[in-house]
Amino acid sequence: MFSLQELCRKNIYILPYPLGKHVLQQLGLYWKGHGSLQRIGDDHVLLQQDLIFSINEALRMAGEEGNNEVVKLLLLWEGNLHYAIIGALEGDRYDLIHKYYDQIGDCHKILPLIQDPQIFEKCHELSNSCNIRCLLEHAVKHDMLSILQKHREQIRLHLALTQILFELACHERKNDIIRWIGYSLHIHHLETIFDVAFAHKNLSLYVLGYELLMHKVNTEAAYIELPNLLSYHLRTAAAGGLLNFMLETIKHGGYVDKTVLSAAIRYKHRKIVAHFIHQVPRKTVKKLLLYAVQARAPKKTLNLLLSSLNYSVHTITKQLVHNVVIYSSTLVVKLLLMRRKNKLNLVDAVLARLVKYSTYTDIVQFMSEFSVSPERVIKMAARESRTFLIEMISKAAWGNHPQTLIHHLKQLAHTMKSQSGKDLIIYTIHYIYLNSNMLVAEEEKNIFKLAKFYANHNAVNRFKQVCEDYYALDVDARFKTLILECFEIAVQKNYPRIANIVDDYVRFLFYRGDITEEEIHEAYSLKDAEFYVDLKWLQHDLF
């Protein structure tokens, strides 16, 4: 509990009128040797109605004098005890420190407030559990170079401690201490200074790192793979977009090559690429373009690389197409198409590779991007024997109606040059036919057309099956017409197996009385028909 006097002392800011020394002493508002003490605002005091100090500065002064009464008053006024301890250390008032020792807590928290190296060490000594390493580490953190210099010999004898202090100085970015350690002591590993410089994009620290590295190379016998280190730094700087770091590295022998610029491309630092692109061989630029496609670089980067090649990429077309497909990176295809001069159309080449190796989803996406017709893709899929693609793209383009699908696929078969591709489309048509409900009277005309289509393309087995299905519809007159028309097709196109199937059906129809001898003679009177059928059976049956 506070006494009434303490409550008054704590909360009175302005005295009502000047009081005498005796009254002030009784109130505890008199500082011996200085005069009256009065609080102003939240964090200042007025001394002898004349001098203004911060409460913490007044605490330091009171601590230096060992004036505990004033210290207690200033603490009531919300001063920081740490300043009283600093003052006590400056005045060697250890009796005062002893009184407040339990309230101090961690002495290391006082260190940032101290500017004097001697007081810094004395404060650190207040912590009984700390050693010389702890002191030196805090000296690094708080820029107390003179303390490190004082203990130089102790540091020099412990290589591990030297490395620890150096790395700590790097992380704290204390350049003066880093430089002193680098020149005065032996450092085994310098990597930390570069790592920190990259992490914080601190060019001055990076420059200092090379200063120490060159000093180490020139003064120590240690072997350093400088070319590899320089290359690593260039790649790291390029990946971070740090052009100034790269220029600094080049000063010391660094060389910008494909791996360096690839890092810049990967992390989308076009300005880095633009700065060095004209310093590398054309062959390297082509490799960078291929990598840019792989990395899905933005438009400006691709245009930069293409323009440096004058958009002449014919020698790497195959690799470009490969990367476009493998990495789903089609932007370069669009850019090459947009050229008014030297336009290069890679759409067909990319599409062909997509159809051969990629998924349905990738192909559909490409079709959408480049307005590719489904017919074009289906033909490619047929040539590559990708039945699944034919079915999926057909349904996506024309719906799931069997007649519509068959109609479009028949058109494709008519224009398909590859026989294996044509056979696959016909196979797909027949698959759709078998899995549909076409074997009804309403579909008679469509089945009629399908049978003629099979005859036209010499699809023997499929023709035979559709003829059987068509006959089952019980449309005798139309069936006879179909058979006779297909015989004409077989003769004209030299399809002996189709002709043999037709001949069998003609005999069957004749025996049933559905076709006359005159109709048979008329149908078989076609030029070269005798090479496909033998009419002796007809003469034999008549006699």
UniProtKB/Swiss-Prot annotation:
Keyword Transcription: no
Keywords from the named record: Early protein
Spans traversing the lipid bilayer: none
Origin superkingdom: Viruses
Keyword Signal part of the UniProt annotation: no
Induction or repression: Expressed in the early phase of the viral replicative cycle.
Record's function text: Plays a role in virus cell tropism, and may be required for efficient virus replication in macrophages.
Similarity remark: Belongs to the asfivirus MGF 505 family.
Name used for this protein in its record: Protein MGF 505-10R
The organism's taxonomic lineage, starting at the top: Viruses, Varidnaviria, Bamfordvirae, Nucleocytoviricota, Pokkesviricetes
